[in-house]
Amino acid sequence: MIETDIRELNEKIQRESQFVDLINLEMNKVIVGQKQMTERLLIGLLANGHILLEGVPGLAKTLAIKSLSSAISADFSRIQFTPDLLPADLIGTLIYSQKKEEFVVRRGPIFANFVLADEINRSPAKVQSALLEAMQEHQVTIGEETFKLPDPFLVMATQNPIEQEGTYPLPEAQVDRFMLKVIINYPKKEEEKLILRQNITNSASKINAVVRPEDILRAREVCREVYLDEKIENYITDIVFASRFPSDYRLKRFANMISYGGSPRASINLALASKAYAFIKRRGYVIPEDVRAVALDVLRHRIGLTYEAEAENITTEEIINEILNTIEVP
């Protein structure tokens, strides 16, 4: 790509990405800390990918997506997943209208721009698969009719750490449909003091709508234009291939630790998330640091560990970090 094209693209992105600061400003009114979580929400929104958040209750996961939807003046719905939830509770159902003497469609909470699927691993597989099908197809079928879901459509699913009781682990094939899996940690001590003050004095500010859904759709188009050099493409595929065939990449010690590596969807999502990250950083091209910044969240749920790895307390994060340290940076 020639220099003038890059310069023009940079200028275009500078113009189109101004809303990022506005959204961050609004979200910072109510969210203390958790910078990575809010940044990953924006990446998912721009790259048209869904997000899986893992963390104990009370870490502002619900507040974050609710604040984001308010800042974009979009529809928000929250679905609490429970063991007795049915697919119809999620997508909707046909109910008989005595007045019309016919069946009419009652739409479920999935019909919103931002859907918070809270504690997704507390409901059985049939409900999980109904949600994941809606995520993949951007449409649902009720009775014999198919309905398109609104655009933009972003699902943020939360799950409790698997060690907790009463949870159903998500199957690997379904987890793979989430672009990012983000681990949410406790806030720092100073941040927690701010949270404390904000909540006991009722000083939290109101979120203002600063962006329209149409602006997000336009930004997505621009995001796709971010330049990805062939060297960066090779870097991305090397990272994903190293998760499948570690011995070919001087990572022999992990050969018996990985049961399966990243799928082609991992390569696609790593490229799209890197483009969105570059967009947020006001750049018209992807650099290796962008790939490294999102690699952990894109790959951590796409690598399966063997019993040997679990016996030695090896984590997917360790493997990904070792891959990033081993693969030559272009």
Language-model segment annotations:
Residues I51, V115, F153:
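Conserved beta-strand position immediately N-terminal to the Walker
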Residues R40-I43, Y96-L116, E145:
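Conserved alpha-helical scaffold flanking the Walker A/P-loop in AAA+ ATPase domains
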Residues M1-E8, I13-Q14, D248-P330:
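C-terminal engagement/docking regions of AAA+ P-loop ATPases
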Residues L45-T82:
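Walker A/P-loop
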Residues G55, D118-E119, A130:
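Walker B catalytic acidic pair
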